[in-house]
Amino acid sequence: MSIDLNWDTVTGGPDGQELAQKIRDFIHEKFQAVPLPRFIKSVTVHDFEFGSIPPEIELKDITDPLPDFYEEQPGIDSSEESDSEEEVAYENEGEYLDDPVEQQYGRLRGASASESRRRLTVNSSTGSRNGSGPNSGRVAYLPPHLNPHYNGGSGNNSSPSLDRDGRYYRDPNTAGLGGPAHGTNHHHADLGSPFLGVSTPGIPGGTSNLNLHYFTSQFTAGLSGTQTPLAAVAGAAHQRGPSWIADQQQQQQQQNNMLPGGAGGGGAGGGGMGGPVAAAAAAAAATNQGLHSSSTPHLRLHFPGVGTGKPTPGPSPLTGTSTPLGTLGTAGGVGGIGRGMGMAGMGSMASMGYPPTAPVLAIPTGPRHKRNPSSQSLNSVGDYSPVAPAPAERQGLFSAAAATSPPSSTPSPAVGLGIGGRGIGAAGAGAGALATSGPRLQIPKQGLREKHSVSTLAPNSAGTSNNRAGSAILDDDDGFLDGMHDHRDHPAQQQLEPEEDEEEEEEGEEERQRFREPRVEDIQAVFRIKYAGDVKLLLTADILLDYPMPSFVGIPVRLSITGLTFDGVGVVANIRKRVHFCFLSPEDAVAAVGGEENKAAGSGNGSGIGGGSDGAKTKMGGLLQEIRVESEIGQRESGKQSLKNVGKVERFVLEQVRRIFEEEFVYPSFWTFLV
């Protein structure tokens, strides 16, 4: 279907002149960015004219728009094209945007600033907003714990512990920290049970929220020091007096006495109350029994996020020595997210707490093992720096001496295992098995292997160590330690995995947001455009002469493009309030329109006699097929020109015109117009 185009209306008048001026400026800017050959100093575009011959336009097809047309363009403001159905309604009529707090919560509920301003209503007579008195609207929407005028849920709120957004609040009338964690109707309050996760001795009000925020902050680093277990313990000790630590020591001693075979360090505290305070309790218990030894190597314990403990006596379990596990010196208390496992030794405790709060062994540096950490691994062998194990100890991470070691005359160590429901960490003494003879303790290698992580450690083909007869700790046939080190079962990992999934979803959402959603009304038209007109482009180029020296003088060359021949396929798409336009390459043009018409036209023109020579040269999709150019150098004197048709300059200019056209107007490049 042919389309008649009123060429004079499009190109004439002030609008046509402005459009021609913009095209001239555009071509001039492109020539300034082109690297010029040595013999041309500069190129300047002076004028552009559309001419009087219109192009021939034929509609070929109506299809769906190309996918690239739906891509968001940051340079174009899309706020003006937002439709009413895409705008999110504000939840509450009359909410205002003066208050920064209101702005924060308004955006969290999904309301845009412009929509909020449009729906802003103020009662000018009383000066109140959604309230019964002056500034009641401002005060009512503050967070409940910052609102001194909040009445505890009186009025329309059905639940006294919910604010207007359905969030729990702490009753402002509750004194101290001993009140319920989430309002007066919270029935868990302070029950003192280590399994409910709401209370810890010395921390009234519970530590369930404290643990969650603190241990997550080890990976996100978003909380201040006042929200750490150390600060909570200090605050509790300040409230209850200096006797609190003594009570903890007494409780620790009672737990130690529960272990068969003698004193054990036991797990210290519950629900994140580990760290230095528990370390002090364990150290005091061990000191009273005289178990410090200055002749043993030092074992340095470090509490991530809390501080570094002092070196305490005891051999390193990762060095080449074959020291019983039970004779580790005094160690710090177990941190941990809540309940878990504690290992008690002779008057001390070998902490096996779960990261990020369990003590991390800082072994003297030796040959290091480097590996790439995986996203599924929190506790990594690569996080430590152990020395190379002795050959006799390569069958397990914690290796033992031979079973024929001479019996020890000293009291045998006791190991307490306290198993909780939420991983490895703090939890008091448990039932322990007693090693009554001299053989050393050994933990099989597969019991401490790391799951769900990528490691370059070569697997040990020797299998499990045969020194099981002298070990009274555990047998890993049931995969007990495998469960200990299954990171996905740990609350911290369970919390991190959804965060990773959320990050992936956000990335996918951002990728989807780069493209708009197609609509039924989106349309695209495919045209075949033929043009053999008298479009004019005037430009000058300065030619440098190298005689008698390089770049001796520059001579201006005037170039005039007086017409061109064009045959191509154009695409115009209308998407919402934008119009996209481009030409297709010759290959895409043939695929979109078909080459049969082009073949028929070529054969028809070839059969003609003496006519249609221009038509025989045209090829559909060939775009710029011919450019007519005139050039002259110097000034006219007595009707003569000094020089015409400088070949090199003409070829360079025509080549650049073709390149600019193809780079700027041929798909995947396209032009967008706001309508």
UniProtKB/Swiss-Prot annotation:
Residues 373-382, 454-469 have a biased composition (Polar residues). Residues 1-675 form the SMP-LTD domain. Residues 66-186, 241-270, 307-327, 365-390, 444-517 are annotated as: Disordered. Residues 78-101, 497-510 have a biased composition (Acidic residues). Signal peptide: none annotated. Residues 123-137, 317-327 have a biased composition (Low complexity). It is a peripheral membrane protein. CDD domains: SMP_Mdm12. GO terms for biological process: mitochondrial genome maintenance; mitochondrion-endoplasmic reticulum membrane tethering; phospholipid transport; protein insertion into mitochondrial outer membrane. Residues 261-270 have a biased composition (Gly residues). Keywords: Endoplasmic reticulum, Lipid transport, Lipid-binding, Membrane, Mitochondrion, Mitochondrion outer membrane, Transport. InterPro entries: Mdm12, SMP_LBD. The keyword Nucleus does not apply. It is found in: Mitochondrion outer membrane; Endoplasmic reticulum membrane. PANTHER family: MITOCHONDRIAL DISTRIBUTION AND MORPHOLOGY PROTEIN 12. Belongs to the MDM12 family. The SMP-LTD domain is a barrel-like domain that can bind various types of glycerophospholipids in its interior and mediate their transfer between two adjacent bilayers. Component of the ER-mitochondria encounter structure (ERMES) or MDM complex, composed of mmm-1, mdm10, mdm12 and mdm34. A mmm-1 homodimer associates with one molecule of mdm12 on each side in a pairwise head-to-tail manner, and the SMP-LTD domains of mmm-1 and mdm12 generate a continuous hydrophobic tunnel for phospholipid trafficking. Component of the ERMES/MDM complex, which serves as a molecular tether to connect the endoplasmic reticulum (ER) and mitochondria. Components of this complex are involved in the control of mitochondrial shape and protein biogenesis, and function in nonvesicular lipid trafficking between the ER and mitochondria. Mdm12 is required for the interaction of the ER-resident membrane protein MMM1 and the outer mitochondrial membrane-resident beta-barrel protein mdm10. This is Mitochondrial distribution and morphology protein 12. The gene is mdm12.
